[in-house]
């Protein structure tokens, strides 16, 4: 499978890549192994997710066997990686020892090359800066011309819009006043109707309210001269009568509201 072939190739690459590492390569080699572990885990998880996409019942046994096979291959690769690691370390140490002089000489050559290229690097920097200045000189007039025209167009648009906006404000104010003129009679009509209805209700309810107030005053006056038991005996019939009259008031109000 591609999974196994790719994993084995990466596994061997970690060992062979050790020959090109610098003096701090042991940590780099460990890092490469850690990256390989993460990659192998990701490939395994992706493969299992792909297998789990087979939802049809006829694939159930095949899906189980394939998932088990992927887990076994992952375990085998990890085992092989563990057995290869000592050989990789030994090979790396040998290569680093054998190539020590060559690497040191190469570092010296690289530093010398870097020093010799410094003047050319500065010259290259100056050439690039000159080219950028040429481009800037060429493009600046075009940009300035565009900006000037754009500013002029915006100013012209603003000039054209000013009278339109003033006319629009005037029309809006006139429309508001016109709407108010049409709306106010409607509001007054509603207010008059509500006032009339409330006045009618007040006239209907007023006799009952007055009678209720007189009865309450009578009960209060009697409460000042009789004992509690006698007061309770006298109040009970009045309370019942008040309940009946209050119910009548509510019925009148409800009927009046319904008619409106």
Curated annotation (Swiss-Prot):
The protein, known as = Apolipoprotein A-I
Return the annotated region ranges for 10 X approximate tandem repeats. Answer: 64-260
Underlying gene: apoa1
Family matches, as Gene3D superfamilies: Apolipoprotein A-I
Keywords, in A-Z order: Cholesterol metabolism, HDL, Lipid metabolism, Lipid transport, Repeat, Secreted, Signal, Steroid metabolism, Sterol metabolism, Transport
> What is the similarity comment for this entry?
Belongs to the apolipoprotein A1/A4/E family.
Disulfide bonds, paired cysteine numbers: none
Any one GO CC term of the record: extracellular vesicle
Region spans: 3 X approximate tandem repeats: 32-63
One Pfam family it belongs to: Apolipoprotein
User: What is the stated purpose of this protein?
Assistant: Participates in the reverse transport of cholesterol from tissues to the liver for excretion by promoting cholesterol efflux from tissues and by acting as a cofactor for the lecithin cholesterol acyltransferase (LCAT).
The principal location of this protein is secreted
InterPro entries assigned to the protein according to its UniProt record, in alphabetical order: ApoA_E, Apolipoprotein_A1/A4/E
